[in-house]
Amino acid sequence: EAFLEVKEYKDKGVPVVGMYCAYFPTELAMAVGAIPVGLCSFSNETVTAAERELPKSMCPLVKSSYGFAIEDKCPFFHFADLVIGETTCDGKKKMYELMAEFKPVFVMELPNSQSEKGLEFWRREVIRTKEYFEEFFHVIITDEMIHHAVHLSNEIRRSLKELCEVMKLDPAPVFGTDIQKMINGSKYRFDFKTTPELVDAVTEKILEEYHQGKHLESRPRILVTGCPIGGDTMKILEGIEENGGVVVAVENCSGVKTLDQMVDETQEDIYGAIAKRYLSTGCSIMTPNDNRIELIGRIIEEYHVDGVVEMILSGCHATGAESIYIRKFVNEEKNLPYISIDTDYSSADKGQISTRLAAFIEMIQADKSGKKELDMNYCYKLIVSGISGGKCFEEILQNVWDYTGVPVRFL
C-alpha cells in the first residue's frame, strides 16, 4: 500500500526524498513539501546482486541497500527525486559514491563527535542542506515552514514514543514484535498530519484493554540494542518472544533511540535546535558514544529490563567494538545478563540464534525464580555445536556462559 501511495503523490507532483539514516533531519524535506521516506535496506533478497560489485565482507545493510538500488527493486528508491546520504560508516560513504553515478545524491558531512565543535559543525551542515534543498526543489524555506515541519515531526515522535512506553507496564500488554512492526509501519504513512491521531488511538486501545485485564503473562523483559532492526533481522525479536521472553524496548535506531528526544521548538535558532536534537543520537560511529550508554541505562530502569540482547551485523566493526562497553555496562553497572548475537540477513542461523536465546531466557527465568538448575547435557550440546560450527574456543565458552551465567574467566 505504501508503494502505491508514494506513486500517487509522485503523480500529483509531490517530490520524494529517500534516506538511509536517522541522522537526516526529515524536517528539511517536509519544509519544502517533499515526502521523506526510508529506503529499502533490510532484505537478503538483493545481497547477492550487490556482491557482484561490493566486497562480500561488507555489512548486509549496505549490500542490501545497494542491491535494491542497482536492481531497481525498491519502489521508494525508484520514485525518489533525491537520495540523502551521510558520512557515518565507511561502507555507506562508498555506497553513496557509487549511487551518485545513477541517482542524484546529496551527502551530509556528519561529525564523529558530539562536542561543542561537533555541534557547531553539524549546525552549519544542516543549514547547507537546507540551502541545497531550496536550490534543488526551487522552494524558499521560510521560518514558518520550518517551524511547522518541526512541530509536526515532534508530534509524530511524541505519539510513537508514548506507544513504545506502554511496554513499561509489567506484565507487558502486548508483544514487542508487534510494537516494532507498528513503529516501522508508521514510517511509511505519508499523510503526516493524521499519523499522531492514529498512533494515539492505538496507544489508548492498548491501555484500555490492559486495565481490563488483557495482557501477556509474566515473561523475562528484554531490551534489544545494536545495529538497525527490521525486515530479515526481525528474527532476533521473534526468537526472543518465541522462546518465552518479551521485547519491552528496541534501543536500535529503528526504535526508541530516534524517538527519545524532541526538537526544542522554543529556541530562537531553530536550525541550531534541529542540529542539537539529531546530533544527540547515540550511534556507534560517535566517539565517545556516551549518549547511547545513558539511554540504555534509562531504558533498563524505566522498562524494568531483565536482560539485554545486542544484535551485531557481520562487518559492522563500530558496533562490534562498542559491544565491549555495552556488555561491561550491563553486567557490571546494571548487574544484568547480556548476550550478543552476530548475524546477517540470511535465515541460515535462525535455529542457532533460537537455541542461544532460549538458553539466555531460561537463565533469566531461573534467576528470577531463585533457582539455577543447569542442564549439563545442554551445555555439552552447546560445545559440540560450537566445534562443528568452526567457532574458536573463547566463543564456545562465551556461549556456555550465556547459558550458565558463569563468566568465561571462571570456566
Per-region residue spans from a language model:
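Acidic/His-rich segments in extracytoplasmic proteins that coordinate ligands and/or metal ions
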Residues: 66-135
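A short, acidic, amphipathic alpha-helical segment used as a generic capping/interface helix at domain edges
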Residues: 69, 287-304, 322-325
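Acidic beta-strand-to-loop metal/phosphate-binding motif
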Residues: 79-87, 306-314, 385
